[in-house]
Curated annotation (Swiss-Prot):
Keyword Transferase on entry: no
Name this polypeptide is given: Rho-related BTB domain-containing protein 2
CDD domains: BACK_RHOBTB2 (cd18531), BTB2_POZ_RHOBTB2 (cd18359), RhoBTB (cd01873)
Rho-like, as annotated region: 1-210
Stretches with biased composition (Low complexity): 706-728
Organism, as annotated: Mus musculus
Gene behind the chain: Rhobtb2
Biased composition regions of type Gly residues, renumbered to the chain: 304-313
């Protein structure tokens, strides 16, 4: 349909609306939002400003734009033609003003100068070129009033002048100027899609009312209302901050390996070939090898270990006191074939190898002779001869030994290994027991497999076989399984206090722990136990202001890398303890757990306002900044309710928090003021409309009285002046 037909259609009012204002206030965006239904994001609007003008030819060349120009306002069919202008082309604007029905005067709420120019330049210019056209004042870019200005300024072009918070104009500033000029005032946001219809519908009303005064015979213009009031815009409720848990520390394998090289708090001495002494830790060896686990649980108070047949076994303190017997048959195969035998890492029972011999090619004959010659025996003090119990060990005993780092004598467990075990391959085995890894470039793989056979570490044998078969990639799954199983054993040792070497004295009791595990997973613990402090040489450490539930949660995290909650766990006390121990990852996990609990309580209609107030300042003081941000968000979005229930607590908040509340509270203060003004103005408008209706005459006259009878026509001819006494 040709656009000229709108001018010829009966009862269709064509409205020419000219949009003027300073550069970059949002005129063209506003026109496109109405004419083309264009939607833009805030970042698109913040792109480099290029002066543009929306061509009036769009109504002729684009059918969609023409269709969207048609509207019905107060039962009047209209066709709205929008005219865009440049903000700085003075000569071109006078042609746009010609025969305009209404003028929309725009300014930006983030640019006070644009509002100042409304009074000093734009309104006088409008009245000069089209003195009878009504004017509508529009505040654009409303979304900047509640936006994050720091993010907005970062997204703008580099040389753009930053938007300052004190430059954001409140609604009353625009309303004051509009009242001074005697024109309606509206606000819009293309980003929020707010106020666009209000502006142009009321601009149409203003144009139709102005036209009604000149074309008073058009009856369809009688019911056109004056420009309506605009309800204030309620900004969207800000979403709660998301608790981000950073990646856990990546030194889970490096620290144990370093602990093996630098044996801090070592409690085991492994003697190889009567001359090589290697310091190690019970907790690492026992949680990685079932053989070491049974060895360290052995009762050393009895000097004799069974009879020559090996029927008398060790007496561990747990359920392993009756080990299952495993017998290996002799096969004359190549060493690599031996490595490919089925193996399982989860072998927890000891193996009776008495009277047996290892596979040919992997075990030296001299070592076999030594083992067969040593049946059972006695050691002075607390110790045992282990020849008939395991082919890997010769004896175990407790003795005073010099610490390799502090050079102080203390009680240690000395384990003499079989003479066939060489130091180099044995260190590779120890590295596996500490880290679960075996290097592909390790030498003496056959000796490593031999030691793994003696210690019954069958997964290590499988890793060696994979390397020999060029299938080392399969060792990753074995390493994962190693860590899973050791984690379970470490948790068991923590629960039972097995192999513990330190006791924490807490407010409500004591809890046993293991220094090597603490040192390898916490720098704070490493400094305490490895530095020149009293705690490094004592078995009891006092932890004031700490409960057993919090310390147990910290120990489980340090041992396993996982956070485990319990019913009696106090979230804030755990955050305080984790912050004291310099564990930011645990702090983040506890923050996430706390926020999840608060949100679940909110969904169950439980009042959490009091808890949030308590959490806020504690979280800020103890570096739980994500929890503090969440608490700030909750208080800001429930500000009125919190103030009503806890007025004293809110007044006792720090000045920084109170300033934050005033700046970020929702609904914001300007909205509450606007809502109050809108309600008062609406009541006044209703009262004015009521009084206006009462003043209207009950009887309306037409321009002439149609004669219904001869007498009436005679009366009409007798008094001709009665025909001109009508009221419209």
């Amino acid at each position: 349909m040709d656009s000229d037909m709108d001018y010829e259609r009966p009862n269709v009012e064509t409205i020419k609306c000219v949009v003027v204002g300073d550069n970059a206030v949002g005129k063209t965006r506003l026109i496109c939002a109405r004419a083309c239904n264009a939607t833009l994001t805030q970042y698109q609007l913040l792109a480099t400003h290029v002066p543009t003008v929306w061509a009036i030819d769009q109504y002729r060349v684009c059918q969609e734009v023409l269709e969207r120009s048609r509207d019905v306002v107060d039962d009047v069919s209209v066709s709205l033609r929008l005219w865009d202008t440049f903000g700085d082309h003075h000569k071109d604007r006078r042609f746009a003003y010609g025969r305009s029905d209404v003028v929309v005067l725009c300014f930006s709420i983030a640019n006070p100068n644009s509002l100042h120019h409304v009074k000093t330049m734009w309104y006088p210019e409008i009245k000069h070129f089209c003195p009878r056209a009504p004017v509508i004042l529009v505040g654009c870019q409303l979304d900047l009033r509640y936006a994050d200005l720091e993010a907005v300024n970062r997204a703008r072009r580099p040389l753009a002048r930053p938007i300052k918070p004190n430059e954001i104009l409140p609604p009353e500033k625009g309303r004051e100027v509009a009242k001074e000029l005697g024109i309606p005032y509206y606000e819009t946001s293309v980003v929020a899609q707010f106020g666009i219809k209000d502006v142009f519908d009321n601009a149409i009303r203003a144009a139709l009312i102005s036209r009604r005064h000149l074309q008073f015979w058009k009856s369809h213009l009688r019911n056109v209302q004056r420009p309506l009031l605009q309800a204030p815009f309620l900004p969207p409720k800000p979403p709660p901050p998301i608790i981000v848990v950073p990646d856990p520390p990546s030194s889970s394998e490096e620290c144990p390996a370093h602990l093996l090289e630098d044996p801090l708090c070592a409690d085991v001495i492994l003697v190889l070939q009567e001359r090589v002494r290697i310091f190690a830790h019970k907790i690492y060896l026992s949680t990685s090898s079932s053989k070491f686990y049974d060895l360290f649980l052995m009762d050393l108070s009895e000097g004799e270990l069974g009879g020559p047949s090996g029927s008398g076994g060790p007496r561990p303190e747990d359920h392993r006191s009756h080990p299952e017997q495993h017998h290996h048959h002799h096969h004359h195969h190549h060493g690599r074939d031996f490595l490919l035998r089925a193996a399982s890492f989860d072998v927890c029972e000891s193996v009776d190898e008495a009277g047996g011999s290892g596979p040919a090619g992997l075990r030296a004959s001299t070592s076999d002779g030594i083992l067969r010659g040593n049946g059972t025996g006695y050691l002075p003090g607390r110790g045992r001869v282990l020849s008939s119990w395991s082919r890997a060990f010769v004896s175990i005993q407790e003795e005073m030994a010099e610490d390799p780092l502090t050079f102080k004598s203390r009680l240690m467990v000395v384990v003499k290994m079989d003479n066939s075990i060489q130091p180099g391959p044995f260190r590779a085995v120890l590295k596996y027991l500490y880290t679960g890894e075996l290097g592909e470039n390790e030498r003496d793989l056959m000796h490593i497999a031999h030691i793994a056979e003696l210690l019954e570490v069958f997964d290590l044998r499988m890793m060696v076989a994979n390397i020999l078969n060029n299938e080392a990639f399969m060792n990753q799954e074995i390493t994962k399984a190693f860590h899973v199983r050791r984690t379970n054993r470490v948790k068991e040792c923590l629960a039972k206090g097995t192999f513990s070497d330190v006791t924490f004295i807490l407010d409500d009791g004591t809890i046993s722990a293991h220094k090597p595990l603490l040192i390898s997973s916490c720098d704070w613990m490493a400094a305490m136990f490895g530095g020149p402090f009293v705690e490094s040489s004592t078995r009891e450490v006092v932890f004031p202001y700490t409960s057993k539930s919090c310390m147990r949660a910290v120990l489980e995290y340090l041992y396993t890398g996982m956070f485990t909650s319990s019913p009696d766990l106090d979230d804030m006390k755990l955050i305080v303890l984790a912050n004291r121990l310099c564990l930011p990852h645990l702090v983040a996990l506890t923050e996430q757990y706390t926020v999840t609990g608060l949100m679940e309580a909110t969904q169950m209609m439980v009042d959490i306002d009091g808890d949030v107030l308590v959490f806020l300042e504690l979280a800020q003081f103890h570096c739980a900044y994500q929890l503090a941000d969440w608490c700030l968000h909750h208080i800001c979005t429930n500000y009125n309710n919190v103030c009503r229930k806890f007025p004293r607590d809110m007044k006792a908040m720090s000045p920084e928090n109170q300033e934050y509340f005033e700046k970020h509270r929702w609904p914001p203060v300007w909205y509450l003021k606007e809502e109050d003004h809108y309600q008062r103005a609406r009541k006044e408008r209703e009262k004015e409309d009521y009084l206006h209706l009462r003043r209207q005459p009950k009887r309306r006259w037409l321009f002439w009285n149609s004669p219904s009878s001869p007498s009436s026509s005679a009366a009409g001819s007798a008094s001709p002046s009665s025909s001109s006494s009508a009221v419209v």
